[in-house]
Amino acid sequence: MANKQDLIAKVAEATELTKKDSAAAVDTVFSSIEGFLSKGEKVQLIGFGNFEVRERAARKGRNPQTGAEIKIAASKVPAFKAGKALKDAVK
């Protein structure tokens, strides 16, 4: 499984940037996506995929310890849908 450090190393290798500059670039991409999503905007990366905020409706759940029914409030969750190029690359 690759992690953030692996991604930073790949960016540094591909761009000949230092790892410090690559880390800043990767952090900027992640924080930018987070910023757009927090404003309710969709981030579309053609071929790679779409990041968006989806609304989850209020629903009933159960407390696993007591079995009592509880109300779970509506919430917003981040979502990602892979694009065609990414899906094809994984096949």
Swiss-Prot record:
Tell whether Heme is among the UniProt keywords.
Answer: no
Entry keywords, A to Z: DNA condensation, DNA-binding, Virulence
| GO molecular function per UniProt | DNA binding; structural constituent of chromatin
Tell me the InterPro entries matching this sequence: Hist_DNA-bd, Histone-like_DNA-bd_CS, IHF-like_DNA-bd_dom_sf
UniProt superkingdom: Bacteria
Q: From the Swiss-Prot or TrEMBL record, give the protein name.
A: DNA-binding protein HU
Q: What does this protein do?
A: Histone-like DNA-binding protein which is capable of wrapping DNA to stabilize it, and thus to prevent its denaturation under extreme environmental conditions. Also seems to act as a fortuitous virulence factor in delayed sequelae by binding to heparan sulfate-proteoglycans in the extracellular matrix of target organs and acting as a nidus for in situ immune complex formation.
Q: GO terms for biological process?
A: chromosome condensation
Q: Recall the taxonomic lineage recorded for the source organism.
A: Bacteria, Bacillati, Bacillota, Bacilli, Lactobacillales
Q: Which GO terms describe its cellular component?
A: cytosol
- Species, as recorded: Streptococcus downei
Q: According to its UniProt record, which protein family does this protein belong to?
A: Belongs to the bacterial histone-like protein family.
Question: Hey, what's the signal peptide range on this chain?
Answer: none
Return the SUPFAM superfamilies for the record. Answer: IHF-like DNA-binding proteins
